[in-house]
Amino acid sequence: MKVKEMTESYIVYRRSLGEKYITGAAMLRCFVRHVGGDTDAMEIGTEVCSAFLYGKDGKVTASWFLRYSALKWMFEWAVVRGYMEEIPLPEEKPRQLEHMTPYIYSKTELKKLFDAAMMYQKNRSKIPPECMQMILKVTYFLGLRIRETVSIRIDDLNLQEPHVIIRESKFNKTRIVPFNHQVREMLQGFAEWRASQHPGCSDEKALFLDRKGQPMCLDTVRGCFQRIREAAGISRNDGAYCQPRLHDLRHTFAVNRLTAWYREGKDVQKHISSLSTYLGHDKVSNTSVYLTMTDELLREASKRFKAYSNGEET
């Protein structure tokens, strides 16, 4: 059986179990492009799998383990059905990376990102800078996952009763995310700009479109973000294995929300469940991790204030 045919059959199988299976499917299709769709599944060897796992840079990243898991499950499925004779993955796995510490953007860095989104392109790109800037703003101001942001449709957006419907996101949940007057005005302005660029688009169309009127590709958006971050001069030097990410905008939103509640004197423990619902977490414990990060942030802010008061910092 050809690799492409086998992979598509496996994806159909996973989805028949009730899974959305989006990320895994995307990784497996990347593997198909890597080895060639017409390659016989029986001919796949350890060397070609290792090259895919390590990527062009030959480094171990978080993606290494995600790719490994996706391939392992598919290969096991294929061996049972006789499509492959063995699992051609390397026997030794690299040491598991430490849990990724989220990067919390400062207000200054957020402004730099939003500004850079309008100026990072050296040549005309298929993604309008206005679109890229709004993707970053919506992801941060609403605390969304980037996949949720790019999946928003026009008919998901309600500007009269300010909210957006996030449909069947992670954990197959649909939720309503409200927003304030300032965000409503921001989205109203963008909707008017979008209508001028793509007249006659149906309400079922994606909110964010490229110059050809096509929905945004997630990988393209992530690639653009890396260039925007570099143009903004934002990097981390704390030994982390990757630079600030798009997803860190969501982490920043959560930490800033909790920090604001602390400063307002609110009982944060009572509010954590509502934040968990807002973020679309399946368990409150997934949201509670931000409490530790917020405590550290407030302690650091307190240190800086004391140093400033004592004339140690200018």
Describe every region a protein language model picked out.
Residues 1-314:
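Conserved catalytic core of the tyrosine transesterase superfamily
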